[in-house]
């Protein structure tokens, strides 16, 4: 059976685990706490592929017709 990367599929946006510095900047920009971010399960196939663990924040960069690209942030939970 051939293994392929989910991230190589055109319908899957770019996912990356944020560093503490990047996260701090985003949280202060939006005046929120980490726990207020939308959630994503650690069992999500993309989380498994990028090696995200509970407590990480994943930055998702999607293509947007109006903005070109738009960033979304998700807190990894159990």
Curated annotation (Swiss-Prot):
GO terms, biological process: transcription by RNA polymerase II; transcription elongation by RNA polymerase I; tRNA transcription by RNA polymerase III
GO cellular component: cytoplasm; DNA-directed RNA polymerase complex
GO molecular function, one term: DNA-directed RNA polymerase activity
Gene3D superfamilies linked to this entry: RPB5-like RNA polymerase subunit
Key words of the record: Cytoplasm, DNA-directed RNA polymerase, Nucleotidyltransferase, Transcription, Transferase
EC number: 2.7.7.6
Lyase found in the keyword field: no
InterPro entries membership: Arch_Rpo5/euc_Rpb5, RNA_pol_subH/Rpb5_C, RNA_pol_subH/Rpb5_CS, RPB5-like_sf
Subcellular localization: Cytoplasm
Catalytic activity: RNA(n) + a ribonucleoside 5'-triphosphate = RNA(n+1) + diphosphate
Family: Belongs to the archaeal Rpo5/eukaryotic RPB5 RNA polymerase subunit family.
Subunit structure: Part of the RNA polymerase complex.
UniProt function note: DNA-dependent RNA polymerase (RNAP) catalyzes the transcription of DNA into RNA using the four ribonucleoside triphosphates as substrates.
Name of the protein in its database record: DNA-directed RNA polymerase subunit Rpo5
Species of provenance: Methanosarcina mazei (strain ATCC BAA-159 / DSM 3647 / Goe1 / Go1 / JCM 11833 / OCM 88) (Methanosarcina frisia)
Gene transcribed to yield this protein: rpo5
